[in-house]
Design a protein with these regions (language model features):
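Short, glycine-/Ser/Thr-/acidic-enriched flexible segments
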Residues: 93-96, 120-121, 136-138, 171-172, ...
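Short, solvent-exposed amphipathic alpha-helical segments in soluble enzyme
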Residues: 1-2, 103-109, 146, 182, ...
Length: 280
């Protein structure tokens, strides 16, 4: 009451609730456990949180009219419109699924979205722009390594000047190789960026809010990764952009650019940015 902020409820400590680490929630066993715990937490929230008041304070209208899969009929209030509709291919499967809903809505405004799976698919869709979002490719390194046809098509697309935007795990898939453990097998990836990635024996989480300053726009995003660069044989970085944390201190990580391929460790939030300018 002293702060002038209404308390809409609380979640008490619950016996038996133990959420798995973020890095392991993608496994089948942990997903099953997580779903069961989510149901228990939901039941508790109904008892201790004023749900109706909470929803009344939200900016969005509920129930939300959009459900997965998101398609190109999503509306966006942004005034920036493309000159023409473009074909956009978005990777989406258990290895690549870290996307912001607003980013998908933004892409849907720019063009017609086709989803594809680097993990299970063989064909790369015809596209003017390919978006490889983040994920945990290190958990599927062997399976991805076997998708030779997919990786060859992706490399040919990049070499002939195709536009690719890769974030986090998406950038790892563009690399030369990936070791899911320090003394393990180096599985070959798409070899678009001459970079070797590895998950160290003692994985250290690199995380935090980031922004890039330079070019004609400022982008903000979040870094969350366990992989590190074991070897980087490239100078194909976009030196005009500097990545900093929110305090303004420079982060020692590059924003890679090779031909029309843009890649970084950051999961960017695009907002109403004119993304096409990234390739101008």
């Amino acid at each position: 009451a002293d702060t002038g902020v209404d308390c809409l409820g609380y979640l008490p400590s619950m016996e038996g609730i133990k959420l798995p680490p973020k890095h392991s929630v993608i496994s089948v066993a942990n997903r099953h456990s997580l779903n069961e715990q989510a149901d228990l937490i939901a039941e508790q929230l109904e008892k201790t949180v004023d749900i109706n008041r909470l929803l009344s304070r939200c900016n969005r209208n509920f129930p939300c009219p959009y459900t997965l899969p998101y398609t190109s009929d999503m509306e966006d209030d942004s005034p920036v419109l493309p000159i023409r509709k473009i074909k956009i291919a978005v990777a989406r499967d258990p290895a690549f699924n870290f996307t912001y809903r607003e980013n998908l809505a933004r892409l849907a405004k720019w063009g017609n979205i086709t989803y594809f799976s680097p993990l299970y698919g063989y064909e790369l869709p015809e596209a003017d722009l390919i978006y490889l979002p983040g994920g945990y490719p290190e958990l599927f390194a062997r399976q991805l390594h076997r998708r030779h046809k997919m990786m060859e098509a992706l490399k040919k697309y990049a070499e002939r000047g195709g536009k690719i935007l890769a974030e986090g795990g998406g950038m790892v898939f563009l690399g030369r190789s990936l070791k899911s453990k320090e003394n393990g097998t180096a599985y070959s990836m798409s070899n678009i960026l001459p970079i070797d990635f590895i998950v160290p024996a003692m994985p250290k989480l690199q995380s935090g809010y980031r922004k890039t300053v330079g070019e004609d726009m400022e982008l903000k995003g979040y870094e969350f990764r366990y992989t590190t660069i074991q070897q980087d044989d490239t100078l194909i970085t976009n030196r005009r952009s500097m990545i900093t944390n929110l305090k303004g201190s420079e982060e020692l990580m590059p924003f890679y650019r090779y031909k029309n391929v843009l890649a970084s460790h950051i999961h960017w939030y695009w907002g109403d940015k004119d993304l096409i300018k990234l390739w101008e």
